[in-house]
Structures are given as structure tokens and as C-alpha cells.
């Protein structure tokens, strides 16, 4: 949605970590106005990277530019203007008495310190980049929880209209008592970060990128819905833990390039349209398919049969399966099965295993298989082996086509559909006669010949002895 804008801001702000430490001041706003206006500050200077900003009661300071500060306090108000950026470097962030209005279109608030003290309110774009905070009490984690039971405001419902990004060392934990979080754009969970949506609802309208760990340790409360695509990136310590919750739901595609795992009754519900794919296979307790999804990777279900209310799409060009582990007994069919083919045409004797389980039950409300050449038929073995097969023999004969590129002539035909045919040739200036001979390599389409204009005419045909 606005991911590029956020990362551009972070690139610019990275230089703030190396700012000079030779000056630090406590600067007070004496009048309401724009942050960039030196006339509203008692020092005659705008608060900077190493300064604290005192906003007294009755004062409203509007951040109308890219501002940076260590700490904001007192009982006044800070208002974000459209497309402005406020970066807060100190661990104490914003005093709980200070009001922050951060909903203007395109604005971004960045916390570089301890996210525990970040203001729990509504934002447009929100960034946690906890890069300069170290927990002084080992062996606790090197990050603090945000918006959980121990937060100064307690668990608080929040709306982030744009994107929310957590990088560095940040832990987000939604407490119960209605601490729902609604994100209108993308959610980016960086390496070394954890998002635990325990006890409340998490809604992301657009895409979710998981580089750290996404989990829900209290699946009995709340639900989690992602309207766009979910991408799980490679991670040695993170991934997507679907354990202890049956209420993960996706409206787009799932791309798994890292670990997805879970035990018990953890499940993902695929409610929209897309593809389940990635460089890594998926192993989770079970899935629900309510929408239309192409199976683009192998999915192993550890404990429970899938709930198939929507449409499953398998492509014969791939070998992906839905596997139900031994010991979990029956895999039950329902919904619609649509088998397509983007690869070579099936031939008699081919078998395609789509499902792998100890036992099979139920039935699809409808099935659709790719068309076959005349004489071939599909055999539906789904109820016994989770597979479909091709039987019969092709009738008719292939049609040879030609194309020329420079001095190369290419002959093509459906050699997979019509096996056994080969190219024969004869050279004869007087026309076609009976002296056909094998070309040797012309047994599989395509067959390419070099044209020599100095030679007599050459004729080609397909033959099946």
C-alpha cells in the first residue's frame, strides 16, 4: 500500500542514530503553532535529535515537517500534519499525559527506542525500530512488550490507517479486554520481532510480511484476518506459529519461504482467491478452504482432515499434494475440485496423486479435469487412492507444422499425445517417391533441420511403423 514510503523514511532516519551528542536541551513550547516555527519555542530553536520537548497544557504543536526529538512530555497536544514524520529516539518516548493526534493522511510516527512507552492511540503510519534499547535485566528478551497487560495504558484498541512496521527488537502483544488492532494497509514484522495477537482481534486489510515471529498464544479469544497476501520470509528464529488458534484467515495468497508450524488444532482458513505456494512445503495441523485456491506447494496436515468448502485447483504440471499424516485416519472431500494443466498433454497410463491419506471419504460437489485427445479418458480414483489417471489409447494422427528462422527449419507435432511417430525424409528433384528414410533424431518434437539452398528439394513426413 505505502510500504515504499515507510522504508524511505527509515533510510533517511538511520542517520539520526549517529547525530552529535554535544548538545541536549529541554525546550518548552510557549504558544501553539507549527513544530518548525522557532517563535513558539522558549529557546528560539526547534527541538532536535538530542532534545526533550515540553508541551504544556493548552498548547497544540503541529508537526508540519520531518521532526526528531528524544522525549515529549507535559499535558499539551502534538498533532501530526499530513505527510509529516515524527521520530522519537528516547526510551521514554511520550509522557502518558501528552495527547498525540496522529491520524492525518500520510503521516508517520517512528519510535527508535523502547516501544513499551510508545503512545497507544490511532495512527496513519506507525513504525517501531527498536535499535538503541537494551533490556537491563537479562535473561529477559532484548525488547519490551507493547500494548499488553503491563502497558501504562493497559490493553488499548488501535487503528493504524496505513502501514505498521516493526523492526529492530520489538514485541507486540495484544492484551484481552478488547485490545483490537485494525491496520488499513500492510503489516511488516521484521527479523527479531514478535507479534502475539493473544486475546483480541487483529485485522490487516492489505498484506502481511513475516520476517520475525507471528503467533497467537490465546486462540480462545479474538480472531485474526488478513485481507491481502501473506508472505513468510526465511527466518532462523521466527516464522508463523498457528498453534493454539483456529481463527487465522487469509483473503489473498500465501507464500511460504520460511517456517510455518503448529500443533493441536491450529488452522489457517483461506477465504478469498489466490495460490498457496512458496519455496518451502507447509506442515500445520489442518486448513480450511472457503475460497478458490491453487495448490502450489505440498501441504501436510498433521492432525485433522481439511475443511473443503470452496474450490481447490491443482495443476498437473506440478506434483503438489495435500497430505494427511498417518494416524489421523480419514480425509473427507467436499467443495469443488478443478484440475488444470499448464504442461505436457497427458497420455495413457499417466497417474496424478492429488491427495495422500490413510483413508478417503465424502465427495466433491463437482469435479473438472483437463480435456484429453480422442480415445483417452479420465479415471477418478479419488475415493480409493486420492488420484486420477488416464486410460485408453489416442485415435487419429498428429499434424505436422513448420516454422523457419533464418536457415533453420523446425518441424513440430504433438509427440507426447501421439508417441511412436518419427520424421522421415527423402531428397528428390522429380517429386515424392517411395524412397523414405529415417532421420535418426527426429523421434521427438520439435525437429530442426539446417536449410542448404544448394541441395535438391527435400520432403518430410511423420511415420508410425
Enumerate the language-model features and the residues they cover.
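Extracellular beta-sheet-rich ligand-binding/adhesion modules
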Residues: 24-328
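Generic recognition of long tandem-repeat/solenoid scaffolds
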Residues: 109, 195, 202, 217, ...
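Acidic glycine-/aspartate-rich tracts in secreted/extracellular proteins
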Residues: 34, 132-133, 317-319, 342-346, ...
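Short loop/turn positions at the edges of beta-strands in beta-sheet-rich folds
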Residues: 57, 168, 244, 382, ...
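Sec-dependent, cleavable N-terminal signal peptides
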Residues: 1-25
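Extracellular, surface-exposed repeat/solenoid domains
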Residues: 159-160, 300-303, 307-391
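Short, surface-exposed terminal/edge motifs of secreted or surface/virion proteins that either
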Residues: 62-63, 147-149, 361-367, 433-439
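Short, composition-biased motifs enriched in small/polar/acidic residues
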Residues: 389-465
